[in-house]
Curated annotation (Swiss-Prot):
Residues 1-39 are annotated as: Disordered. One of its GO terms (cellular component) is plasma membrane. MFS-type efflux transporter; part of the gene cluster that mediates the biosynthesis of thethe mycotoxins phomacins, leucine-derived cytochalasans with potent actin polymerization-inhibitory activities and monocot-specific antigerminative activities. PhmH might be involved in the excretion of phomacins. It is a multi-pass membrane protein. Residues 1-11 have a biased composition (Polar residues). PANTHER family: MAJOR FACILITATOR SUPERFAMILY, MAJOR FACILITATOR SUPERFAMILY (MFS) PROFILE DOMAIN-CONTAINING PROTEIN. Its main location: membrane. This is MFS-type efflux transporter phmH. The chain crosses the membrane at residues 45-65, 101-121, 134-154, 161-181, 199-219, 237-257, 268-288, 307-327, 344-364, 372-392, 399-419, 437-457, 515-535. One of its GO terms (molecular function) is transmembrane transporter activity. GO terms for biological process: transmembrane transport. It is found in: Cell membrane. Belongs to the major facilitator superfamily.
Length: 568
């Protein structure tokens, strides 16, 4: 085992009995308990661990780079297709078939999607090929966190999640520059060249290296005591089907609402209603006695600290996308910056985010306390929103640089510490489903994090556009103000009209930030529902890294017969 401690068996991921993982038991390790101040023992990680971790980091880098490059050039549809793929189904499959095979499978799907993109002969084929990539990328993003949880004690997970985000943020930072340069020359020819260059020089080589590292070094234990038919019976088909259907219905409505159709149009109202009802139905199904193997066990939400941490995770992703999507509008529509220069202007938060993800993880690992980190980081968020609301044409560069740095501090510290709060109150047997649920609620946060501020922005802009000439106003109807928020479009107007349009953008953005203050404040207040629970320093899992030598294979085979645990 990685931690050097003995592995103890834990139950399958089913509904836990009331005595397991409940708040009453875990209150013994609350914020006033002495174990929180204990210094964790030094953990030794073998070379095989670091090589496997390198494979995970390379996979995360490719996934982040892929999404950020093409999304810059094809933002609305492509970003939407990638927004709802982190389904808890991956967590359940990883429990039943093991982390190694599911992770390798997700990576292969991602690489396959890349190949399909390269062979696409039309925009529609490209979009659906990107959807295949999204399915693989969703599994990659979730399974990386899950495997880290399997290989690293809870107290130390923040360090590794922060280190992982250095790789992920590198991809997310480089991508917009490449995509922005191509967007400046936007045409189908340039976009097609972008796709081909990305696939043949980034996705396939780096993805191939990552896949090879995973195949060679990601050898983890796996509880293999069930037949294939029994595993299939334990997949929550009903719950997963409802969740996937509801998510795509919401995704469709939020993608086209206010743009292609009005919000009251049946094309939008119907799927949005169906999606929201579906989420409620999925929740009740998971809580019902008929669901024997829930994909999102009720235990996750019955515990106060875990439930609060899930909500905070959702809100933090919502606010992150709130800022990530509307600062570029300010740069391009108000400061008249090109897409490439707007990408440069986002560097402060792009640099601060991964650095403070590492800092936040290190603080939690050192102190064993996550609640203080959450109070500080969520307290910064409404401040950032408030400061952003005063930005206009005359704002100095120092202002928007500092505001973005503050967001990087806030978002970075949260991204690497919320999972520990989710899992602190849960037994180790819930690692897979808790990571799956955590990924799902964060994925929902990304969807609403674009849709809510976009609706606010478009509604406010429509109100302000009454002062425009009717011919000009027609250009901004049905959500086109967001789509037309580019320097090239704004500069196409005569100076007088241009200033009126820019002022409308300033006022619409101000409303977006003002309402963002409320969302940030709610996130801050929700931290008070968390309890400071002792973070375990020992690792007890059925899925830890295998360090056995080849000469011990026979002994391992006997272990399979005795307790059903094998090595992948």
């Amino acid at each position: 085992m990685v931690s050097g401690t003995d592995t103890t068996e834990v139950g399958a991921t089913t509904k836990a009995p009331p005595s397991e993982g409940t708040e009453g038991i875990l209150d013994d390790h609350s914020s006033n308990s002495q174990p929180q101040a204990e210094k964790p023992a030094k953990t030794h990680y073998p070379l095989s661990f670091w090589l496997a971790f390198l494979g995970l980091c390379c996979t995360g880098l490719v996934s982040a780079l892929d999404g950020s490059i093409v999304a810059t050039a094809l933002p609305s549809i492509i970003e939407s297709l990638d927004g709802g793929d982190d389904y808890p189904l991956y967590g359940q499959l990883a429990d039943l078939w093991g982390r190694r095979y599911v992770m390798i499978g997700a990576t292969i799907i991602f690489i396959l999607g890349s190949g399909l993109c390269g062979g696409s002969s039309s925009m529609n084929m490209l979009i659906w090929s990107r959807a295949v990539q999204g399915i693989g990328a969703g599994g990659i993003n979730m399974l990386i966190d899950m495997i880290i949880c399997d290989l690293v004690p809870m107290r130390e997970r923040g360090n590794f999640i922060g280190l992982l985000f250095l790789f992920v943020s590198l991809g997310a930072t480089i991508g917009p520059f490449v995509g922005g340069i191509l967007t400046d020359r936007a045409s189908w020819r340039w976009l097609w060249l972008l796709i081909l260059l990305q696939i043949f020089y980034i996705n396939l080589p780096f993805g191939g290296v990552a896949l090879l590292l995973l195949i060679l070094f990601l050898h983890v234990k796996w509880k293999n005591d069930l037949s294939t038919m029994e595993r299939l019976r334990r997949v929550d088909v009903i719950g997963n089907s409802i969740l996937i259907g509801a998510t795509f219905a919401i995704l469709y409505a939020l993608t086209y609402g206010g743009t292609r159709y009005t919000w009251s149009d049946p094309h939008i109202a119907a799927p949005l209603t169906i999606g929201l009802v579906g989420l409620v139905a999925a929740f009740f199904w998971e809580m019902s006695p008929w669901c024997k193997y829930p994909v999102m066990p009720p235990l996750h939400f019955q515990n106060r600290t875990s439930a609060a941490a899930f909500f905070i995770s959702f809100m933090c992703m919502l606010l992150a996308f709130w800022i990530n999507f509307f600062y570029p509008v300010y740069f391009q529509a108000v400061l008249i910056a090109s897409p490439t220069r707007a990408g440069v202007y986002t560097l402060p938060r792009a640099i601060a985010f991964p650095l403070f993800a590492a800092v936040g993880g290190a603080i939690v690992s050192k102190t064993g306390r996550y609640r203080t980190v959450h109070l500080v980081s969520t307290g910064i968020m409404p401040l950032v929103m408030g400061l952003s609301s005063i930005l206009d044409q005359g704002s100095s560069k120092a202002e928007w640089v500092i505001w973005q740095l503050l967001f990087g501090v806030s978002g970075g510290m949260m991204i690497s510490t919320t999972l520990q709060a989710v899992q602190a109150a849960l037994p180790e047997s819930e690692v897979a489903t808790s990571v799956g649920t955590w990924s799902f609620v964060r994925s929902l946060g990304t969807i609403w994090g674009l849709s809510i501020p976009a609706a606010i922005f478009n509604n406010r802009f429509d109100q302000l556009s009454t002062q425009f000439d009717p011919s000009i106003r027609a250009l901004f109807t049905r959500g086109q103000a967001y789509e037309h928020g580019t320097a090239k479009f704004i500069q196409s107007f005569d100076p007088e009209t241009r200033q009126i349009v820019i002022q409308a953008y300033i006022e619409a953005l101000k409303r977006v930030w003002q309402i963002g203050i409320v969302f940030g404040g709610v996130t801050f207040l929700s931290v008070f529902f968390e309890k400071e629970i002792h973070l375990r320093t020992e690792l007890k899992t059925d899925f830890g890294l295998d360090e056995k030598k080849k000469g011990e294979v026979a002994k391992e085979e006997n272990d399979v017969e005795n307790n059903g645990t094998t090595v992948q």
